[in-house]
Amino acid sequence: MFNFQDIYHIGIRVPNLSRAMEEMGSSLSLTWAEPIQTEAQSIWTPEEGQRYLPLKFVYSCEGPQHIELLEGPPDSIWDGRQDSGVHHVGVWVDDVANQTEQFLKNGWTLLASSVSPEQGYGGYTYIAPNSGMIVELVSQSILPRFERWWAGGSLAK
């Protein structure tokens, strides 16, 4: 499937990004990349289809396993108001579509993706087995952008 050692982040849903950065940053001795706020994050879910949602997120600069904090809109996969805390682990993969299909063949469920399965899933998917652990498969093609961001640069293309 993939190398589980390629986990590069733990995704945590939070109700308030700034507050969580303060609390966790000082307590865990973390520094943060520049927080990102987008008004139109692409997400497809089986229940809602394609949508574009507001999202705030940030990563710790320290690695190789980073902390990702996410503040999403109500009733979204990123909503930390009702159910904050550890949400998923993120893993770099060479081919999001292929890896996702392999997991689905093994009984995992597709929770969300950047675009629909018919469009090839896009750059990320959230998948889970019946046991409930959520894994985010992320295209390794964006790793250079993330490395630049963690080093103090921009995440933009």
Give residue spans per PLM region.
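Hydrophobic secondary-structure block in the mid-to-C-terminal portion of proteins
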Residues: I127-K157
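Conserved active-site beta-strand-loop modules that form the wall/rim of enzyme catalytic pockets
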Residues: Q65-E68, M133-V135
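Vicinal oxygen chelate
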Residues: I7-P15, Y59-Q65, P74, G80-V96
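A cross-kingdom feature marking solvent-exposed beta-strand/loop segments within repeated
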Residues: T38-P46, P74-W78, V86
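Residues that flank catalytic or metal-binding motifs in active/ligand-binding sites
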Residues: D6, P54-K56, G85-H87, G123, ...
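Core segments of cupin and vicinal oxygen chelate
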Residues: F2, R13-E62, N98-Y121, W149-A156
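Active-site beta-strand termini and strand-to-loop segments that position acidic
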Residues: S60-G63, Y126-N130
